[in-house]
Design a protein with these regions (language model features):
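Conserved residues at the C-terminal ends of beta-strands
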Residues: 48, 117, 175
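Short polar/charged helix/loop
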Residues: 131
Length: 183
């Protein structure tokens, strides 16, 4: 399935979600992430600060920020910088995303677990992002466990057409499914 068709279909499905459904899905997905060894064992975790149309990470960030070292991406040209998450030091950055202030840049190689946002995933861990390649470029330099999260309809049955630069995730978690990529 072509990436642009997937982006259109997922956008339409998202627009039908109620606030209640959004909250329930986020709770269920992050409850399961918490119980996974990959999360329990990891201390340095790259999260994302959710946009309104993404599975919300707000509650989860708040719940665990005292016990894990969370990091967030910050757009820097065509690349993503990685900085520590501190609730008091966020500003609205590129694309209206809340991003960390300061210059405490962290090496991607020091991150143990990455929660990777996407428009959709297939059962092989392939992903469709927002089409700017930010995560693909960053993930190319990482050996961390990569976890995709989303609503049920963001896990699609058809295989996604991949390009050579696409980096798959190891695990996809949705409300009803946990998919582990075969290696
Ligand atoms: N929460 C969150 N943070 C993230 C990402 C993400 O997908 N989600 N990113 C993942 O890469 C990076 C930012 N990349 C982004 C790329 C495009 C758009 C976006 O809104 N695109 C519009 C098109 C508008 C335009 O071209 O200016 C769109 O999708 O409709 C947002 C973020 C880093 N931080
Ligand atoms: N490692 C890379 N090096 C150079 N260019 C890249 C790399 N990865 C992706 N790109 C470029 O980024 C653009 C978008 O790629 P693609 O459509 O796969 O993004 P995406 O997976 O939807 O986005 P994202 O990775 O931000 O979630 C393409 O033009 C691609 O050539």
């Amino acid at each position: 399935m072509k990436k642009d068709d997937i982006r259109r279909t997922v956008r339409a499905r998202k627009s039908l979600l109620t606030e209640n459904e959004k909250a329930e899905a986020a709770q269920s997905v992050f409850d399961r992430l918490e119980q996974m060894a990959a999360f329990m064992m990891a201390d340095r975790i790259l999260m994302y600060h959710s946009l309104p149309d993404e599975l919300s990470t707000r509650d989860f960030l708040g719940k665990w920020s005292g016990r894990k070292h969370f990091f967030l991406p910050r757009v820097n040209g065509v690349n993503l910088d990685i900085l520590p998450y501190e609730q008091t030091r966020l500003h609205l950055g590129a694309f209206e995303i809340e991003e960390p202030d300061g210059n405490d840049l962290t090496d991607i190689a020091d991150i143990e677990l990455i929660i990777v946002p996407a428009v959709a995933y297939d059962r092989h861990g392939n992903r469709v992002g927002r089409g700017k390649g930010y995560y693909d470029r960053m993930l190319a330099g990482s050996r961390a466990t990569k976890v995709g999260v989303g609503y049920d309809f963001q896990l699609i049955d058809d295989a996604i057409d991949t390009d050579s630069h696409d980096v798959p995730v190891d695990i996809v978690i949705t409300q009803s499914h946990t998919v582990i990529r075969r290696r």
